[in-house]
Amino acid sequence: MKFIPHTDEERRQMLKHLAVENTDQLFKDIPSELRLNRDLAVEGGLSEMELQSHMNSLAGLNTGVDQTICFLGAGAYDHYIPSAVKHILSRSEFYTAYTPYQPEISQGVLQSIFEYQSMICLLTGMDAANASMYDGASALAEAALMACAVTRRDKVLVASTLHPEYREVVKTYLHGPGIEISEIAYQEGLSQLADIDQKLDKKTAAVLVQYPNFFGCIEDLGKIAEQAHAKGALLVVCVDPIALGILKSPGQCGADIVVGEGQSLGIPLSYGGPYLGFMACKDKYLRKMPGRIVGQTVDVEGRRGYVLTLQAREQHIRRDKATSNICSNQALCALAATVYLSLVGRQGFKQVAELCLQKTAYAKELLAALPGYQLPWQTPVFKEFVLKTKEAPEVINRELLKENILGGLDLGGYYPELAGHMLFCVTEKRSRREIELLAARLGAIS
Amino acid sequence: MKVPSELKYTKEHEWVKIEGNRAIIGITYYAQDSLGDIVFVELPSVGDAVEVEEPFGVVESVKTASDLYAPVSGQVVEVNNEPMDSPEVVNQDPYGQGWMIMVEMSDPSQIEKLMSAEEYQALIEA
């Protein structure tokens, strides 16, 4: 089988039509010193069987949550996924990451997105949610841009308790438009309210915080909302949706825009993606929200129907003026989240959150009681907590891996002042036996 | 197509009513008719500067979103909230209740470059 579609004869005809002698002439505008001038350093092809075997051996080098007991979180979580999620997801009528280009024909997809938006609104306590975004970090950055557009201001305050990689993404997004970023100091694992007050000014478009934050600690959103609003700034909250099963919703606490990573909602850990960003806001900011929305309406005969709205700004005529580059979509991941939420149900979702809370509390108590380990802060946490260790985190993790345990995140790389501290995560999937095993192994290491 | 004779026009389908040093700006009957049902209007704030031939706002209809281009340069001294609160007013009364902004002109000679009603009529019939 030929994989290169053009025959020599076809190439000759094309060149003749273009009145050039050979293909090289087509590239003559590129200076020769910039051209590769040699063959690519890749080997010849493999047969399908050889390739499959090669890929399998590469895949075998990975360590996944199926082979290990995972206490690693920090933005990517090992939650239980009901098996029905993947079966519904792989139905061919749903199986695309795109929202449809002839949207109104695809009523089923539109309805699923409408349900998704409705669930995100319920979870976050916001009025409107868009049809989804790339991931939590880019959704947060887009929310910062949106807040600047709403307030017509050009500075944002970012909590240093926010995921360090999310902060990097925010910096990248805000660099182009020249928006100033100021970071809020933390104390006892929480954003320092006094520092927020000090840094908030009439130029500040928004305060960005995470809830629960990167350390698993639960920020006082109500207080931060008051501070932000007093200066005319918006409160942007980046949430772990699972936590919203038991925590007061950001909307109830006064948030204006809520974003987050939806991976926890039925999307597997798969080397970092594809993930799901969600974004919701108060009604009055709806028009400044990037992306599109699926709306519910009735047709001329009064029958229920769904429509894709707010897409013209981004997709068609005004693309150059769009505040965001969200022109593709994570519809399949949004569908996974929708199916997950509908399967676990309101009560089940609350139970997942409660199990995370209880199991984390149990692990925290067991680990802190071990010699050589202590809790740096007494702040309430949800599904993650920081543990100070005597032995180097790197050594600890290497030892744990020998026992098939994925340990916590070494915080020193992100927060130099927290060298010798680890971030552990306990989801509802961890059993009592596994938590006790972790404690036993850690006890043996120190 | 209604093209009131006392107004000036741009090729981007805005109309301008001159009152002393001030220009009242809206979009034409033809523009609203071509856009279809208008669902959203975004306008600048009082005090903002607008630049001739540069976008100053957006009208969004069920089928498209279009920029509004300033016919003259100057400072926005008044903004009509009605198109923002009830965008359909632009469809219903483009030359009246659907007006958009009033600008204090910085260079009134720019008016000379605008089209007369006859010229605009010829443009939309072309």
From Swiss-Prot, chain A:
E.C. number(s) listed in UniProt: 1.4.4.2
Q: Which residues form a coiled coil?
A: none
- Give the record's keywords alphabetically: Oxidoreductase
Q: Which Pfam families match?
A: GDC-P
Name the Gene Ontology molecular function terms of this record: glycine dehydrogenase (decarboxylating) activity
Reading the lineage from the top rank, the first entry is Bacteria
The answer to whether UniProt assigns keyword Oxidoreductase to this entry is yes
Q: Describe the subunit structure.
A: The glycine cleavage system is composed of four proteins: P, T, L and H. In this organism, the P 'protein' is a heterodimer of two subunits.
Which protein family is named in the record?
A: Belongs to the GcvP family. N-terminal subunit subfamily.
Database matches in NCBIfam families = PRK00451.1
- Briefly state the protein's biological role: The glycine cleavage system catalyzes the degradation of glycine. The P protein binds the alpha-amino group of glycine through its pyridoxal phosphate cofactor; CO(2) is released and the remaining methylamine moiety is then transferred to the lipoamide cofactor of the H protein.
Question: What is the official name of this protein in its record?
Answer: Probable glycine dehydrogenase (decarboxylating) subunit 1
> Quick one: which gene encodes this?
gcvPA
